[in-house]
């Protein structure tokens, strides 16, 4: 197939210029959230080192929840603040999330929705597949499977990158090196309730994505509603399949992501109620 006949060629050339990373952003953990969480743990009788570790993890949960919320609903920033606040409550009551898992999810979402305004590049791919390998090696084999699935889906949606098919195959190959000997794990009802709440509140976001006005950070172009909806669907698929297969440990790891989904859903609901009341008062 000639280059001019390749349906992927325009996307490949317009989004491949410069750098080896297209999805990452710096995150600052040295803020008030860390200090507050550290103080809370110290008051609970923990030593300084344990308290600081807890504080950093709590701050990470807040920031990753906020960042993931921006990928789920890039039009309504305050939903991320709500999700971040809920993630702190979850960290204090249920324990901290897993930063590696949250980072993996963040990159998967950004690859699918392209809110960065750039496709995934070699550095992003190495990072994603390495995390999938690492988690698979620890017995969580579903992560490389989901990584491969995400790559294949990305190759088929608007502006898809044809090499994603090969990367998907590589991710599936990594599954062969995963530890599949771990037995099935139980899932506590508290996580089932959180998953159900996230699903109910987040579902309207998929419809609202059709009218998104968000623009990519790098190219300044309106992001594809289809890609955003695919990313939202992937979020639900990942958020529910991983805990069902791998149990409480991975449910706790993904709790900040659920809080992000709940946060954007709550803000969308409040926004809709306010608009309905405003329209009613105008009549």
Where are these regions (language model features)?
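N-terminal topogenic module of multi-pass integral membrane proteins
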Residues: 1-123, 230-283
């Amino acid at each position: 197939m000639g280059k001019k006949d390749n349906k992927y060629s325009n996307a490949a050339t317009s989004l491949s210029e410069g750098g080896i990373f297209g999805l990452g952003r710096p995150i600052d953990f040295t803020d008030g959230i860390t200090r507050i969480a550290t103080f809370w743990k110290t008051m609970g009788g923990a030593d300084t080192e344990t308290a600081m570790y807890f504080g950093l993890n709590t701050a990470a949960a807040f920031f990753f929840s906020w960042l993931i919320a921006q990928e789920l609903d890039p039009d309504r920033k305050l939903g991320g603040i709500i999700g971040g606040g809920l993630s702190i409550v979850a960290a204090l009551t249920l324990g901290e999330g897993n930063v590696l898992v949250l980072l993996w999810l963040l990159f998967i979402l950004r690859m699918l929705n392209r809110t960065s305004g750039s496709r995934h590049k070699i550095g992003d791919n190495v990072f994603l597949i390495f995390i999938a390998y690492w988690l698979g090696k620890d017995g969580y084999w579903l992560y490389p499977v989901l990584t491969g699935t995400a790559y294949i889906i990305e190759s088929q949606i608007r502006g898809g990158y044809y090499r994603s098919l090969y990367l998907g195959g590589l991710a599936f190959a990594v599954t062969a090196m995963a530890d599949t000997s771990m037995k099935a794990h139980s899932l506590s009802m508290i996580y089932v309730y959180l998953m159900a709440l996230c699903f109910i509140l987040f579902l309207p976001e998929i419809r609202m994505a059709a009218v998104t006005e968000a623009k990519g950070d790098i190219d300044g172009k309106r992001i594809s509603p289809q890609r955003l909806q695919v990313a939202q669907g992937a979020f639900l698929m990942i958020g529910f399949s991983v805990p069902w297969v791998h149990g409480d440990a991975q449910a706790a790891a993904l709790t900040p992501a659920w809080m992000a989904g709940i946060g954007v859903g709550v803000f969308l609901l409040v926004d809709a109620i306010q608009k309905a009341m405003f329209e009613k008062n105008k009549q």
